[in-house]
Amino acid sequence: MTEQKYIVALDQGTTSSRAVILDHDANIVSVAQREFTQIYPEAGWVEHDPMEIWATQSSTLVEALAKTGIRSDQLAGIGITNQRETTIVWNKETGKPVYNAIVWQCRRTADICEELKARGLEDYVRDNTGLVLDPYFSGTKVKWILDNVEGAREDAEAGKLLFGTVDTWLVWKMTQGRVHVTDYTNASRTMLFNINDLCWDQKMLDEMGIPASMMPEVKRSSEIYGQTNIGGKGGTRIPIAGIAGDQQAALYGQMCVEAGQAKNTYGTGCFLLMNTGQEKVTSKNGLLTTLACGPKGEPAYALEGAVFMGGASIQWLRDEMKILAGAEDSEYFATKVDTSNGVYVVPAFTGLGAPYWDAYARGTIVGLTRGVNSNHIIRATLEGIAYQTRDVLDAMQADSGIKLANLRVDGGAVANNFLMQFQSDVLNTEVHRPQVTEVTALGAAYLAGLAVGFWNSIDELQDKAVLDRTFEPHDDEEKRNRRYKGWKRAVKCAQTWSELHDEDD
C-alpha cells in the first residue's frame, strides 16, 4: 500500500455513539464517543431520539478523524455495529421519524405479546424466527407505533413509511435516503424475519398488520451497501461495507466463525453466543436461535443466551451494599479469602434470564454462617457471574451436541483475573482473553475491511487476534461438581421465594 489507509467502525450503543478508527494491523488509532439522552416517558418505557442518535454518531466520525489528522480520502470503508432490536419508523418523503426510537429494553408491548400468545403464535415464532414472544424484539414495537401514532397506519398502508433497526436508519441517513438496507444479524432480531428461508416472514407481518413495503432489503454482513461522504471534504465517497448487531459483531471480532466457537461479553449483563455454522439448532433449553456471521460475513446460525446480572451485581455491592469503593476492587477482596465459605449469591434482582426464564425469581444469598464476612460475599458474587455463564454454556452444549473447545471473553469485567480464572475452573475449559478488548468495533471493522479488500482473507484477520492471556482450569472434577451442585440448590432457593410468597398471601 502506497499510502496509509484506515477502516472505521461506527459503534452505535444504548447509551453512546462511538467511532473507532483502525489501521491495517488492526490497531486502534483513534476513538471518539458521545453520549445521548435516555427518555423514560412512563415506567418500563425507554426511548431515544433518532435525530440525536444520528447527530451524535455522525459527529463522532468527524471528531475521530480530527483527533489524528487522518483525511477522509484515507478511509477504505466504514463498518456499522449497533444496539439491536431498537425500532425506528420514519417518513421516507420528509426523512423525519414519526415517533421516537423504541429501545430494546422497553416493555410497553407486553400486552401485544400476550395477545399474540393467545392467538397460538408461540410455536410459530420459535420455529420460524428463532425467538420467543417478548417485548424485547422489534416486531411488536413497530405494531405499537402504527397503532398509536396518529396517521401512521394510513401512511404505512400508502407506502410512505419505512422501518429500520438502528443500522438501517444510519445507512439511510448516510446515503441521503438512497439506501434502505439491513443485514441478516439485525433482521433476525425483529421477530419478523424467517431464519429458515432467510426472508421477511409474511405471516408475522400479517399478524402484526405491518405492510411489507416498510421493510428494508436484507443483505450479508460484509458487502458494499452504498457510499457516503460523511465527514468528508470535497465529496470524498466512502463505501459503507459492513453491518452487524453488537453481539454478533463481537462474535466475529473474536473470530468465532466456525461451529462450536463461543464468546461471552461481560457487561451489565452477560451475552453468550455460540456459532453453530450452517446448522440451525432449535433450543430445548431456553436459548434463542439467531443469525451470526460465517467466515466471509455470510449468514450462519448461532445460539444466544442472556444473563441479566453480570457486572451489575458488582455495582450493587458498590452502590447499594457499600462494601466496595470501586468495582475494580472486587478482585483484591475476593482473593483475601480462599473460598466463599459455603456462600452463594444468586443475583436474580430482576428475575433470571437464560436458561431459567423465571421473571419471579429474586436475589438470594444462601449458606450464611457466623464466620462469613464481606470478602466472602464479594467472592461469592463474582462466582455467581461465572456460574450463570456455565448455566448458559451447558444449555448450548446440550442443544448443539458440540463440546466447547474454549471460551473467548470480552467486556469490562474480563480485567478481573480472579473472575476469569474461576470461570475457567467452573467450565473446565480454557478462557481466552484478547489483547484488544474492543471486539464489537473490531467485528464491524473486519466485516467492512474484507468487503473492500482492505484485508484479503479471514486467515489474515486470525493472525491479528492476539491473546492477552489464557486461563486454564485448575480444579479437580469432584470439587467442581460439588460447587456447581451447591449453585443449583441456591438457584432453587431464588426461584422458590415467589412460590412461598404466593402461599402467604
From Swiss-Prot:
InterPro entries: ATPase_NBD, Carb_kinase_FGGY, Carb_kinase_FGGY_CS, FGGY_C, FGGY_N, Glycerol_kin. Its EC number is 2.7.1.30. Sn-glycerol 3-phosphate binds at residues 14, 84-85, 136, 246. SUPFAM superfamilies: Actin-like ATPase domain (SSF53067). Glycerol binds at residues 84-85, 136, 246-247. Disulfide bonds: none annotated. ADP binds at residues 14, 18, 268, 311, 412, 416. Inhibited by fructose 1,6-bisphosphate (FBP). The keyword Ribosomal protein does not apply. The keyword Cytoplasm does not apply. PROSITE patterns: FGGY_KINASES_1 (PS00933), FGGY_KINASES_2 (PS00445). Keywords: ATP-binding, Glycerol metabolism, Kinase, Nucleotide-binding, Transferase. One of its GO terms (cellular component) is cytosol. ATP binds at residues 14-16, 268, 311, 315, 412. Pfam families: FGGY_C (PF02782), FGGY_N (PF00370). Gene3D superfamilies: 3.30.420.40. Transmembrane segments: none annotated. One of its GO terms (molecular function) is glycerol kinase activity. NCBIfam families: glycerol_kin, PRK00047.1. Belongs to the FGGY kinase family. PANTHER family: GLYCEROL KINASE (PTHR10196:SF69), SUGAR KINASE (PTHR10196). This is Glycerol kinase. The gene is glpK.
